Amino acid sequence: RTSSSAASDVYKRQYLNKVGIGEKWNAFPSELSGGQQQRAAIARALCMEPSALLFDEPTSALDPELEQEVIKVIKDLALEGRTMIIVTHDMKLAADVSNHVVFLHQGLIEEEGSPNSLFKSPKSERLQKFLSSTRAA
């Protein structure tokens, strides 16, 4: 959105700092860990100033330490009031950052509502079974 190279660098660094990798502003993707690559992707998306962000399994291929770095960024974005649509099997993440959860089964809405109602008192048998299997893992 800026025309000069210097202004563009400032803009890029602003968003890289926001996601915790400002020191990597000049690194190549191959020089970044999986979590850093994921956060760089979030910074790129934020540069577009979107009205909503879409995350598709943002932590699924990350080891636990890197996963926590990405989760922190997503939680910070939620605290800012950003609109996010997150496709995830991570029920803790969904419970922590959502104000509305939609549980899908075979591509159809099985149940939806607040995180509190869905996770504490699921109505559908399929959601009950899913939650009990994720709690046991």
Regions found by a protein language model. Name each.
Residues 1-7, 11:
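Single conserved hydrophobic/aromatic residue that forms the stacking wall/gate
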Residues 28-32, 36:
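Conserved ABC ATPase signature
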Residues 53-56:
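Catalytic Walker B motif of ABC-type/P-loop ATPase nucleotide-binding domains
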Residues 94-96:
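A short, surface-exposed alpha-helical micro-motif characterized by mixed small hydrophobic
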Residues 112-113:
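ABC ATPase "signature
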